[in-house]
Amino acid sequence: VYVPVEELSPVKEYICSVSVPEDKPLNYALINGKAAPVVKNENGSKVVTWILKNIPAYYPMESTPALSGNIPVILANTYPSMADALKVLKSQFTAAHEKEVMALAQKLLQGKNADEKEAVLMNYVHGLGTSRLSLSETGYRIRPATEVIRTAYGTEAEKINLLAGLLQAAGLQGEVKVAFGVKAPDNCLGLGAISQLFLDSPVIAGIQEYQPVNT
């Protein structure tokens, strides 16, 4: 659960409840707010409820309202740790080990010198179509890089995964990392709190679309 309270008009009272089975551990936090949650066990469920009062209006022009402390954010998840949550994504970042990716890198870089490699690979990925679906809209599923190659399009996450795989197949550094949209205790940062995937690679340093935001 990642609930930024982004209301365009001031709110006198805002109520948010999260329910899980009573025996399931739940990590939760309210960021940029002081209201203490009410925790109850009801009919075999654990229910955590926040009642927020007098919330100021949210202004959409703010690029990082949660990080700046201007809006309350409610976080909740059942993962044992942030690392466990990220394993859901990490298990899908397999591009560098796919035969089709290695073959494509070899084909694209045939006859190219070392200084040309990263530009050739980036231009290829840039040339693919882009689906605007976010991670949450895809259910945090990332199609295999081979499927992205076959269909010639991908989400931003899928294209970053493919580029990382191509770079690694070419002997260059490229690692997919995440940026979170809010600062919170690690165990409260589930998948919903991810604001963007980005590529950590010295060979593309300064390329804006692959850099982290909201860190």
Where are these regions (language model features)?
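Short, conserved helix/loop micro-motifs enriched in His/Cys and acidic residues
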Residues: 129-152, 184
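Active-site-proximal cofactor/substrate-binding loop regions of enzyme domains
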Residues: 114-120, 125, 132, 146-151, ...
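Residues embedded in well-ordered secondary-structure elements
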Residues: 5-7, 145, 194
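Secretory-pathway-linked proteins and extracytosolic
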Residues: 1-138
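Conserved aromatic-histidine-acidic binding/catalytic patches
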Residues: 4, 109, 148-155
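Short secondary-structure boundary segments
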Residues: 58-73, 152-168
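Hydrophobic/aromatic-rich core segments of domains that either
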Residues: 157-215
